[in-house]
Regions:
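Glycine-rich beta-strand-centered segment in the early N-terminal region that forms part
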Residues: 23-40, 52-101, 139-141
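Short amphipathic alpha-helix with an adjacent loop that forms part of the alpha/beta core around
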Residues: 226-236
């Protein structure tokens, strides 16, 4: 079968389209083989190509998000059958450690991600466990392959950040950095569902205008404005109750300056770098909570799928690229031009 692979880490020139062996014909008892119709890119895929501190088995197939059609099921699969239209939850737990038994699947000692630790979705067919698959809900208008592929990773990540970890409440002020990416746009929608007052930033006025149309209460250009000062002015010097920062080094200091007393800063990554610091005296005096968040558990995934079916969390697709042009999709993501998810159409 055809797949986009990397044979070494480095730049985007390492990505190539080639033939790879198809998944084994014999499935495990709870495994499902899915024919991929569309795959969506995430910053994780850029990090994989550049070289995460992992031992890859080359050639490695990137891609965490995907949607497609069930081709075959293992003997003990009870909830799916061939022909079902499905989307994938890329975070795979082993269901045997103490964290899994407590329902904290994203803390699993053997947690693995499609496209990172395992072969990914930039291919024609993948095998994943039954519990990592959801039937695509029926919506009007129908959810297309691109939207279904764009849904899982960013929505699950944003849901856990805002609902489970930061516990955003009605009337709170939430600051979201870097509107335009999939996680930040999902966070925007979830924060509005929670009844928050929403401040978002971007260096692109076009993205800020789009965010306003999507429900942002205030938009700030972090290329021309001092974000912490603006947030303090907007909140009568109180600061934000919650700051959503997945940018990292470039925004960390400003995030803390914008954070109010008793505030919560929640992070799922560091696209500009992982090394940050702060004065511990400010941490305990202002009684801040600094929260990490990664993906989500099975209950959270079921909840976001349910809400998608209710029409609440429909993802935003920036652009769809043909399978043959996947490298161009990576390049668009790397330039930060997107407003929503960059998707690759694998098959019709």
């Amino acid at each position: 079968m055809r797949a986009w692979v990397i044979r070494a880490t480095g730049g985007l020139d390492q990505i190539e389209l080639t033939d790879v062996p198809s998944p084994a014909a014999t499935l495990g008892p709870r495994d499902v083989r899915v024919g991929i119709r569309a795959a969506a890119l995430n910053h994780l895929d850029l990090f994989v190509v550049q070289g995460l501190p992992l031992e890859y088995r080359f050639p490695h197939i990137p891609g965490a998000d995907g949607a497609g059609v069930v081709e075959a099921v293992g003997r003990d699969v009870a909830t799916l059958r061939p022909g079902d239209r499905v989307m994938l939850n890329p975070g795979i737990a082993d269901y045997s450690c103490e964290y899994c038994r407590a329902g904290a699947h994203s803390l699993c000692r053997n947690y693995r991600m499609l496209g990172e630790h395992l072969p990914g979705t930039l291919t024609e067919s993948v095998v994943v466990p039954e519990q990592n698959i959801a039937v695509i809900p029926t919506l009007v208008p129908p959810l297309g392959w691109a939207e279904a592929a764009a849904f899982s990773l960013v929505t699950l990540t944003a849901w856990r950040m805002l609902v489970t970890r930061a516990q955003v409440r009605v009337g709170e002020t939430v600051l979201i950095w870097g509107i335009g990416g999939g996680v930040s746009l999902a966070a925007l929608r979830i924060a509005k569902l929670r009844g928050a007052n929403l401040i978002v930033t971007s260096s692109s006025d076009a993205k800020l205008q789009a965010a306003k149309r999507l429900g942002a209460d205030v938009t700030l250009n972090h290329g021309t404005q001092k974000i912490s000062q603006e947030v303090r002015a907007l909140t009568n010097k109180r600061g934000a109750d919650v700051v959503v920062d997945s940018v990292g080094e470039a925004t960390w200091d400003e995030s803390l300056r914008a954070l109010g007393r008793g505030g919560r800063l929640v992070s799922c990554g560091g696209t500009t770098g992982p090394k940050v610091g702060f004065d511990l005296r400010r941490l305990f005096w202002y009684q801040w909570s600094i929260l990490g968040s990664t993906m989500g558990n099975d209950a959270e995934y079921r909840e976001i799928v349910r809400r998608l079916g209710a029409g609440e969390l429909r993802p935003i697709v920036d652009r769809v690229f043909p399978f043959a042009d996947a490298r161009a999709a990576f390049e668009r993501l790397a330039r930060g031009e997107q407003l929503g998810k960059v998707v690759i159409q694998v098959a019709d």
